[in-house]
Swiss-Prot record:
The keyword tRNA-binding does not apply. Its cofactor is [4Fe-4S] cluster. This is Dihydromethanopterin reductase (acceptor). Keywords: 4Fe-4S, Electron transport, Iron, Iron-sulfur, Metal-binding, Oxidoreductase, Repeat, Transport. Pathway: Cofactor biosynthesis; 5,6,7,8-tetrahydromethanopterin biosynthesis. [4Fe-4S] cluster 1 binds at residues 159, 162, 165, 198. It comes from Methanocaldococcus jannaschii (strain ATCC 43067 / DSM 2661 / JAL-1 / JCM 10045 / NBRC 100440). Gene3D superfamilies: 3.30.70.3270, Flavin prenyltransferase-like. It comes from the Archaea. InterPro entries: 4Fe4S_Fe-S-bd, 4Fe4S_Fe_S_CS, DmrX, Flavin_trans-like, Flavoprotein, PSI_iron-sulfur_center.
Length: 246
């Protein structure tokens, strides 16, 4: 296989709605920007991806990766049609690589079945038509158990209903129910203000949980490996290895 490395590369980075491997994906993309001279990254973010990126407090970092210049646009699915002009660049082979990390099981299932009804799945489909190689990091790589970290949450055993967290939340993401307080993750910006003011250490960030990778999702990942010009990677750090960055 012939791969193009070097200066003036253009990459599309697709983000879907997975929290697993999200922070690692950001670390890798920032590292690519540092290590590859004049690298241009166009970032595509699905609707669910935007919500998840915000709740993990990473949204602001997107502008350090895609600053809005030509071929460095930040494309949010909620602001653009599925047939965004950016995907046309892919079908014309204007980019060197497409990277989808992390890729949800839903995204992978659509891709392997030829469904291109969203910004990200359409981009991957057009990349295949334009001979643009896609590096995809599925969160459901192999059937079994994986450990992942959650965004902000409230430990109800520690919470004393002082409501200080509600007062400092800039987006109204924390609400009081009858006898407990809850973080609405769909509105959370991941700013951490609530954790800073909580006198009872009831705000939890990065709690580890176990999740099952279903066999059907792992099977779809296997099918993904069979698609033309698609390279499936187990972890975002393997992207660095692909580009010979140590």
């Amino acid at each position: 296989m012939n791969y193009r490395f070097g200066i003036n590369m253009k990459i599309v980075w697709c983000i879907t709605g997975a929290g697993h491997l999200l922070r690692e994906s950001f670390q890798v993309m920032k590292r690519l920007k540092e290590e590859i001279e004049d690298l241009k990254v166009t970032t595509l973010v699905s609707r669910a991806g935007e919500e998840v990126v915000k709740m993990y407090g990473l949204f602001g970092e997107l502008y350090n990766i895609s600053n809005g210049n030509y071929y460095e646009e930040l494309i949010l699915e909620r602001e653009h049609p599925y047939s965004s002009p950016i995907t046309g660049r892919l079908s014309l082979g204007k980019y060197d690589y497409l990277i989808c990390s992390p890729a949800t099981g839903n995204t992978v299932a659509k891709v392997v079945n030829g469904i291109a009804d969203s910004l990200v799945t359409n981009a991957i489909a057009q990349a295949g038509k334009g001979f643009v190689k896609s590096l995809i990091v599925p969160v459901d790589y192999k059937a079994g158990i994986v450990t992942t970290k959650l965004p902000y949450a409230i430990d109800k055993k520690k919470c004393k209903l002082c409501l200080k967290c509600i007062n400092v939340c800039p987006n109204g993401a924390i609400v009081k129910r009858d006898n407990f307080v809850e973080i609405l993750l769909s509105k959370c910006l991941g700013c951490g203000n609530c954790k800073k003011v909580c006198p009872y250490n009831a705000i939890i960030e990065g709690k580890e949980i176990k999740m099952r990778v279903r066999k059907i999702d792992a099977e779809n990942t296997r099918k993904l490996m069979e698609l033309e010009d698609v390279i499936v990677l187990k972890h975002p750090y393997e992207i660095l290895e692909f580009f010979n960055i140590r």
